């Protein structure tokens, strides 16, 4: 039999001879450099991460990388320390989401992000190892250069000046902009606050609702949408906003999924419930009702999020 070539050049087209069919997997692994057993591939990757003392490994990233490689070879790479000035969540986003790298942390009790990462590569040989490592560092560096530019630009822009720009971001057809949505969220949160004993001031709710979506028009969130809330919190802290507001900018998006944490602050909880209630009502008003197979606006997730928060 002949092992088929691939874009990754895992095989070389060498003819592999089998004495019996049961020799297929072992022969393919030894001579064709393809490990067919996904569990074995994942075990090899996990063992290396454990050896590198990385315990907080993203299981979704681990699963994804397992199925991206045929003969995993972990390589530890290093990028310039100057990029550690970029906020940690942004660095991690660049590494994990875009490049499928595993960030390396130092310290067990208080993990601190380092300027190293682990890339799981295919077809590594002594001759091409350094070339592969240099290539991955070069690609990540380009990402980090962009991230650094966006971060420097965003932190110099007052979040307050971004709020009016939300009027140019569509929430849903027939239901206005994100600016209109945050105004509805403000009214709902004020009502919820009254129903629960006025736990926070009316002014704090108004300010929290105004700021909670402000980073959606930042350059960083435009490039990295999953950082919504986190960017606003970080920029707000630099600009000395009320700590309750900066916390709520991030926490009102929680929980992201059923295993996620819920907001631990009152303002964030009120805004989180109000935001989800608005989304649910708007979707039903717009006939965007979830079915057994479709829920593009995450209505079910919003409902489950409210239940988790109020429990």
Regions found by a protein language model. Give the residues of each.
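Amphipathic alpha-helical "coupling" segments that flank catalytic cores
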Residues: 1-311
């Amino acid at each position: 039999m002949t092992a088929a070539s691939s874009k990754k050049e895992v095989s070389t087209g060498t003819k592999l001879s089998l004495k019996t069919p049961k020799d297929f997997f072992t022969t393919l692994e030894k001579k064709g450099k393809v490990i067919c057993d996904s569990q074995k591939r994942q075990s090899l990757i996990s063992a290396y991460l454990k050896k590198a003392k990385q315990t907080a490994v993203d299981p979704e990233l681990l699963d994804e990388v397992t199925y991206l490689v045929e003969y995993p070879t972990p390589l530890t790479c290093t990028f310039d320390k100057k990029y550690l000035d970029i906020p940690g969540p942004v660095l991690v986003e660049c590494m994990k989401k875009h490049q499928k790298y595993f960030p390396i942390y130092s310290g067990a009790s208080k993990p601190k992000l380092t300027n190293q990462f682990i890339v799981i590569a295919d077809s590594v040989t002594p001759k091409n190892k350094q070339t592969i490592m240099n290539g991955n560092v070069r690609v990540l560096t380009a990402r980090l250069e962009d991230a650094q530019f966006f971060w420097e630009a965003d932190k110099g822009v007052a979040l307050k000046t971004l709020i009016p720009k939300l009027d140019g971001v569509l929430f849903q057809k027939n239901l206005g902009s994100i600016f209109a949505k945050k105004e509805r969220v403000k009214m709902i949160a004020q009502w919820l606050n009254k129903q629960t004993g006025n736990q926070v001031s009316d002014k704090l709710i108004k300010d929290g609702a105004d700021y909670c979506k402000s980073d959606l028009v930042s350059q960083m969130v435009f490039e990295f949408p999953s950082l919504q809330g986190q960017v606003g919190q970080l920029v707000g802290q630099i600009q000395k906003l009320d700590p309750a507001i900066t916390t709520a900018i991030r926490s009102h998006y929680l929980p992201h999924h059923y295993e996620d944490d819920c907001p631990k602050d009152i303002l964030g909880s009120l805004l989180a419930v109000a935001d989800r209630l608005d989304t649910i009502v708007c979707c039903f008003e717009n006939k965007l009702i979830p079915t057994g197979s479709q829920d593009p606006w995450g209505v079910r997730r919003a409902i489950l999020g409210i239940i988790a928060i109020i429990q």
